[in-house]
């Protein structure tokens, strides 16, 4: 069963201020597509600013893969309104293009049509594009066009002061990092609840499989859709955004030094497979290096410990310097039922679940047990809505029905919700518990259940196109609420100035720059 956290919940009820001041941020990816759903072949619109230097509007792997990043926010409503304002602004400046509302791409005829994201002529800009060239040559470009939502979350210092007795962030960084690793271990053990409730990629276009072998028993529709009847998130499966070669890196989440050492080892360990790709052929770079990971960001994980980096600092060096500052949840598919790809209910659920993960005991986890937890995730990802589906506890030694585990978890989450709602006029968090709990009695009410029903009727391509057009009209017609047009235009212009400044400050050629990285 789930850990008994009754004592921790009683503690929380006595210390409600410990969770006042949670900080959050959202990153949302979305492909630019044409009116008929084809991948846009135009460059990143200049009017949106520099993809290299804009704080809120950038690109991910491909030139057509937009990424929107909110600032850190303590207010859920303000956070989501800011994100929606970015969407409104972009929607008005895409011409006849629109934003694809699903995680899985559809109308991509050939990987050759996927242009890598471009960041200008500076060394740092060329480095970013070359890293993406490496990803393309290692994993294929199509996999990299899969979109998701990342949720950044940090507990206030008051939580760690009350719970762990730390004085301040600097002197308490060891205890705070240990607390976040406890959260992460619980996330690996129980985070499958996220794709169960919010997975929204139960189907793919047949073009996505072109030339790839799979043992998955797909069912077909006449319109060329492939689906698994009980799947929740094919994006998180081996078909999607994962990397099998990373499963034996031995990265664990028990303490900071061991985690960082394993990560640093991975970026220094040569890979025979990637050595065959080569670094440079006929004067053209193919990847940054031939190691298992080109850089630390290449590590695919459903959750990451993070700290804001300083100039020239790697993510792991930042962690060693100051400890874990926040965590990044990476298991959310694009929510197709929201114009911004994520909803208030999801944000509030994640707050509740991540607080639960921080409160619950989490025994240390070996690399073997980490692989064991993957079995539960895979079961939920591929057939989570199957009647009577179970998850394994204690490395598969006990099997329990998902519905049973989910309801036990939600009994705890409701008590956390009552504490959070005590600060508000409305019982928002408790309402989310009521809304989502239904999904354990009726799996067809989950995102994947609702979406697959729709897709079987209309085809996944049609669903994507119809939603894209609906959201384009909706967003481009809405007034801005927390940002102004002047702010957005000024930020875009400032980003171009910053890019030009970065380009003018380069003092060495790209070959020499690469050698210093």
Swiss-Prot record:
GO terms for molecular function: ATP binding; glutamate-cysteine ligase activity; metal ion binding. GO terms for cellular component: cytosol. Gene3D superfamilies: 3.30.590.20. Its EC number is 6.3.2.2. Disulfide bonds: none annotated. One of its GO terms (biological process) is glutathione biosynthetic process. It catalyses: L-cysteine + L-glutamate + ATP = gamma-L-glutamyl-L-cysteine + ADP + phosphate + H(+). Keywords: ATP-binding, Glutathione biosynthesis, Ligase, Nucleotide-binding. InterPro entries: Gln_synth/guanido_kin_cat_dom, Glu_cys_ligase, Glut_cys_ligase. It is an enzyme of class 6 (ligase). Belongs to the glutamate--cysteine ligase type 1 family. Type 1 subfamily. This is Glutamate--cysteine ligase. It comes from Pectobacterium atrosepticum (strain SCRI 1043 / ATCC BAA-672) (Erwinia carotovora subsp. atroseptica). The lineage of its organism: Bacteria, Pseudomonadati, Pseudomonadota, Gammaproteobacteria, Enterobacterales.
């Amino acid at each position: 069963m789930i850990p008994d956290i009754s004592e921790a919940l009683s503690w929380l009820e006595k210390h409600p201020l410990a969770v006042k001041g949670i900080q959050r941020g959202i990153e949302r990816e979305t492909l630019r597509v044409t009116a008929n759903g084809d991948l846009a072949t135009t460059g990143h619109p200049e009017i949106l600013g520099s993809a290299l230097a804009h704080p809120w509007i950038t690109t991910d792997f491909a030139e057509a893969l937009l990424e929107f990043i909110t600032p850190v926010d303590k207010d859920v409503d303000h956070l989501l309104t800011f994100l929606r304002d970015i969407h409104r602004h972009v929607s008005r400046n895409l011409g006849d293009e629109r934003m694809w509302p699903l995680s899985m791409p559809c109308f991509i005829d050939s990987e050759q049509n996927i242009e890598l994201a471009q960041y200008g002529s500076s060394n740092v800009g060329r480095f970013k594009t070359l890293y993406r060239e490496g990803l393309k040559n290692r994993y294929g470009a199509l996999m990299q066009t899969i979109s998701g939502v990342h949720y950044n979350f940090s507990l206030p210092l008051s939580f760690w002061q009350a719970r762990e007795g730390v004085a301040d962030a600097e002197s308490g960084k060891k205890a705070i990092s240990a607390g976040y690793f406890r959260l992460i271990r619980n996330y690996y053990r129980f985070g499958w609840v996220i794709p169960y409730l919010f997975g929204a990629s139960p189907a793919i276009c047949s073009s996505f499989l072109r030339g790839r072998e799979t043992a998955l028993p797909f069912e077909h529709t006449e319109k060329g859709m492939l689906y698994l009847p009980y799947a929740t998130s094919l994006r998180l499966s081996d078909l999607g955004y994962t990397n099998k070669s990373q499963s034996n890196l031995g990265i664990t989440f028990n303490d900071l030094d061991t985690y960082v050492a394993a990560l640093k080892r991975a970026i220094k360990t040569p890979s025979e497979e990637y050595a065959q790709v080569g670094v440079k052929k006929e004067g053209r770079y193919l990847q940054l290096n031939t190691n298992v990971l080109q850089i630390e960001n290449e590590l695919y994980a459903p959750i990451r410990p993070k700290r804001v980096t300083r100039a020239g600092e790697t993510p792991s060096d930042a962690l060693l310097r100051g400890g874990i500052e926040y965590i990044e949840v990476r298991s959310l598919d694009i929510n197709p039922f929201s114009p911004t790809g994520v909803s208030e209910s999801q944000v509030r659920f994640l707050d509740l679940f991540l607080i639960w993960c921080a409160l619950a005991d989490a025994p240390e986890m070996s690399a073997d047990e980490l692989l064991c937890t993957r079995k539960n995730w895979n079961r939920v990802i591929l057939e989570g809505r199957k009647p009577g589906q179970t998850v394994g506890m204690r490395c598969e030694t006990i099997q329990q029905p998902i519905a049973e585990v989910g309801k036990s978890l939600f009994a705890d989450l409701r008590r956390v919700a009552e504490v959070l709602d005590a600060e508000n006029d409305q019982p928002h968090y408790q309402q989310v518990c009521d809304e989502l709990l239904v999904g354990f009695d009726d799996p067809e009410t989950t995102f994947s259940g609702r979406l697959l029903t729709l897709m079987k009727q209309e085809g996944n391509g049609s669903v994507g196109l119809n939603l894209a057009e609906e959201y384009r009209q909706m967003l481009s017609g809405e007034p801005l609420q927390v940002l102004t047009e002047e702010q957005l235009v000024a930020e875009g212009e400032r980003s171009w100035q910053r890019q030009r400044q970065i380009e003018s400050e380069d003092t060495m050629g790209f070959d020499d720059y690469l050698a210093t990285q």
